[in-house]
C-alpha cells in the first residue's frame, strides 16, 4: 500500500474491541506523535494527504444509555458494531476520554 493511499484493510479488533488502520496509524505516529488531540487544521492536512472524506460516529449517540455505560465501564466495545456509510471504510475504532468512536473514510 502506498504511503499516500488509504484503502480498506482487514479488521481484526483487539480484546477490547479497538482497531486502527495501519496506514492511518503510521501517519498519525509520524505527524502527531506527541499531540494529545488532532486540531482541525491537522485533520484537514490528513484528509488532503490521503484525498479522503471522513465521518466520525460516537458510540454514546448510537447505543442505548445502559449499554453505553456497561461498555465504557468495562472498557470493552466488542459488542459495538458501527456500520460504515455507503462507500466508507473503517480507519479507527477506539476510546476517547469520554466516549468511544469510530472513524470512517472514503476516497474522493
Model regions: which residues?
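N-terminal "domain-start" segment
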Residues: 1-65, 69-78
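Short, compact, well-ordered microdomains
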Residues: 74-108
Amino acid at each position: 500500500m502506498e504511503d499516500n493511499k488509504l484503502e480498506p484493510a482487514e479488521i481484526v479488533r483487539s480484546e477490547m474491541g479497538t482497531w486502527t488502520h495501519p496506514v492511518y496509524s503510521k501517519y498519525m505516529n509520524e505527524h502527531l506523535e506527541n499531540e494529545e488531540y488532532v486540531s482541525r487544521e491537522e485533520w484537514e492536512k490528513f484528509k488532503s494527504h490521503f484525498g479522503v472524506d471522513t465521518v466520525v460516529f460516537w458510540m454514546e449517540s448510537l447505543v442505548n444509555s445502559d449499554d453505553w455505560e456497561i461498555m465504557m465501564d468495562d472498557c470493552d466495545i466488542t459488542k459495538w458494531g458501527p456500520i460504515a456509510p455507503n462507500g466508507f471504510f473503517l480507519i479507527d475504532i477506539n476510546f476517547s476520554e469520554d466516549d468511544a468512536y469510530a472513524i470512517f473514510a472514503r476516497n474522493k
